[in-house]
Curated annotation (Swiss-Prot):
Organism listed in the record: Shewanella loihica (strain ATCC BAA-1088 / PV-4)
Keyword check for Ribonucleoprotein: yes
UniProt name for this protein: Small ribosomal subunit protein uS12
PROSITE patterns: RIBOSOMAL_S12
Alphabetical list of InterPro entries matching this protein: NA-bd_OB-fold (IPR012340), Ribosomal_uS12 (IPR006032), Ribosomal_uS12_bac (IPR005679)
GO molecular function: rRNA binding; structural constituent of ribosome; tRNA binding
Pfam families named among the record's database cross-references: Ribosom_S12_S23 (PF00164)
Modified residues (3-methylthioaspartic acid): D89
């Protein structure tokens, strides 16, 4: 326990909490424009062509965002919404694209887990 004199000389410093999603600026989602849409390969034990987009956000940040689901309609200059959430086997990808919002279409023919992919309820 520090004495009063010690605390006067050097006050207690607040704990600094480092965020995993700095580009969001404490917002749940951010809007951005795709500057490049491409595929990349995952880390060692896995093998695939993962779809990602380089996005210029409204606050000036440029981040890489993962495009989940089967098939997408994104291209350069598409306006998309991104949320936090990293992709474990893609280094440097800390954001996800929100499907079914703005220019990003939902996943067609999606039956289960539809809310995560912006898919409407099928007609019976």
């Amino acid at each position: 326990m520090a004495t009063v004199n010690q605390l006067v000389r050097k006050p207690r410093s607040p704990k600094v909490i480092k965020t995993n999603v700095p580009a969001l600026n404490a917002c749940p989602q951010k809007r951005g424009v795709c500057t490049r849409v491409y595929t990349t390969t995952p880390k060692k034990p896995n093998s695939a062509l993962r779809k990602v987009a380089r996005v210029r956000l409204t606050n000036g940040f440029e981040v890489t965002s993962y495009i989940g689901g089967e098939g997408h309609n994104l291209q350069e200059h598409s306006v998309i919404l991104i949320r936090g959430g990293r992709v474990k086997d893609l280094p440097g990808v800390r954001y996800h694209t929100v499907r079914g919002a703005l220019d990003c279409a939902g996943v067609s023919e999606r039956r289960q887990g539809r809310s995560k992919y912006g898919a409407k309820r099928p007609k019976s």
